[in-house]
Amino acid sequence: MARTTGDPAKRRRCMSRIKFWRRSRVGSEVVEKDTKRFKLSLIKAWLLRIRQEDYKYSGSFQEAIKPVLIIAQIFALMPVRKVSSKFAEDLTFTWFSVRSYYALVTILFFGVSSGYMVAFVTSVSFNFDSVETLVFYLSIFLISLSFFQLARKWPEIAQSWQLVEAKLPPLKLPKERRSLAQHINMITIVATTCSLVEHIMSMLSMGYYVNSCPRWPDRPIDSFLYLSFSSVFYFVDYTRFLGIVGKVVNVLSTFAWNFNDIFVMAVSVALAARFRQLNDYMMREARLPTTVDYWMQCRINFRNLCKLCEEVDDAISTITLLCFSNNLYFICGKILKSMQAKPSIWHALYFWFSLVYLLGRTLILSLYSSSINDESKRPLVIFRLVPREYWCDELKRFSEEVQMDNVALTGMKFFRLTRGVVISVAGTIVTYELILLQFNGEEKVPGCFEN
C-alpha cells in the first residue's frame, strides 16, 4: 500500500500547531516557576523593607523636627538653609537667600498691615472686634520677627543639641528611634489639619456677609477679598491685585499664629524625650550593682541636658511668651463672644470649633511644656530604688542637683512652664472673664459692614 503524504500546506500547519502546544505546556511550567520566584522576591523585598525601616530613623532631634521646619519655610518662617538634612552641621543661615528674602518681605507685609490696623482702631472704630484684629496682626508681626531672630541662632542650637544627644545612652530599639519623629509628625499633622479646617470655616462664615450685603453685588469674589482685609482697604483703594495680596497675608498670618504653638510643642516634646531617654537608662540599672563612674556619667549627661534646656529657652522664650499670652487673650475674647447670637449656622460652627480647638491646643501645649520639668524631677524616684550598699557620694550629689534645679521652659523668665501653669492659666481665664462680663454691654447680631 502506497504511503500518502497529503497536502503539504495542511501538514505544515498541523505540525506547527503540535509544536505550539508542546511549547505552551512546557512554558506553563516555566511561568509557574517564575510566578513562585516573583512571589518569593516580593516577600524578600518586604522583609528587607522592614529591616530598612528599623534603621530609617536615627532618633535625633534634627531628624524629627525636619518636617516642621520645611512646612514653616513654606509659610515664610525659619529661613534656615538645608533643613532637610539629618545632620545639624549642614544647617546654615544667610541673609542672601531666597528664604530670607521671602521671610523679610512677609514680615514687611505683616508690619504694614499692623500699622493700618492701628490707624483703623485709633481713628475709625474702637471696639472689641477691631481691637481683637489689631492684637492678632501685631502678635503675628512680633511672632514672625521672633522666628527670624531664632533662625539666625538655630544652626548653633541644633549643633549643641546634636552634641548632647551623642553623649546620651544610645537608643537600641527601632521603636525608640522612631518614637520622637512620629510624635512630632502627629502633632504637626493634627494641628495643621485643625487650623486648615478652622480657616475654611472662617471663609464659609464670611460668605454670609458676601451674600447678604456685598460690597459689589455683581462681583462676589471682589466682595470676599475686600471683606478679608476691610480695615486696610478703608485707607487704600481696592484693586483685585491688592485683594489677592491681602488674602495671602491673611493665610500666612493664620498659619504663623498656629505654628507658634506647634513649634513650642515640638521643642517641648523633644526636650522631654531626651530627659526620658536618660531616665529610662538609669531605671534599668537602678536595682543592679552600679559604680561611682556610672553615676558620674549619668550626672554629666543630666547637667548637659539642663544646659541645653537653658540654651533653648534663651532662644525661644519670646516665642513662648507670645504663644501663651495670645492664647490667653483669645480664649477670654471667644468665651465672652459665646453669649452673642450668631447670624448664621456657619458662624456658630466656626465659632465653637475655633473655641474648642483653641482650648484644647492651649491645654495640650501646657501639658507638653510641663513634661520637661516632670522628666527632670523623675530621677528622684529612680534614686529611691538604688540599694543601700551601692549608694555613694556621687549619687548624693546628683540627687541634690536634681532637687535644687528647676528645669523648665519660660516665658522670658516671667513664668516657668510646670504642671501648675495649667491651673494658673485656668484661674487667670476665669478672673479676666468675670472682669470682662462686668463691662459687657447688650449683645446683638452683627450686621452688615459699613462703608
Curated annotation (Swiss-Prot):
Keyword Transmembrane helix: yes
Membrane topology: Multi-pass membrane protein
Keywords, in A-Z order: Cell membrane, Membrane, Receptor, Transducer, Transmembrane, Transmembrane helix
Organism domain of life: Eukaryota
Main location: membrane
Transmembrane portions of the chain: 101-121, 131-151, 184-204, 224-244, 251-271, 345-365, 421-441
Record GO terms (molecular function): ionotropic sweet taste receptor activity; ligand-gated monoatomic ion channel activity; sweet taste receptor activity
Tissues in which the protein is found: Expressed in Gr5a-expressing sugar-sensing cells.
Matching InterPro entries: Gustatory_rcpt
Pfam families (alphabetical): Trehalose_recp
Disulfide bonds, paired cysteine numbers: none
GO-annotated biological processes: monoatomic ion transmembrane transport; sensory perception of sweet taste; signal transduction
GO cellular component term, pick one: plasma membrane
Compartments where found: Cell membrane
Topological domain ranges for the Extracellular compartment: 122-130, 205-223, 272-344, 442-446
Spans within the Cytoplasmic topological domain: 1-100, 152-183, 245-250, 366-420
Function: One of the few identified sugar gustatory receptors identified so far and which promotes the starvation-induced increase of feeding motivation. confers responsiveness to glycerol and is required for feeding preference for beer and other sources that have fermenting yeast.
Family: Belongs to the insect chemoreceptor superfamily. Gustatory receptor (GR) family. Gr5a subfamily.
Protein name listed in UniProt: Gustatory receptor for sugar taste 64e
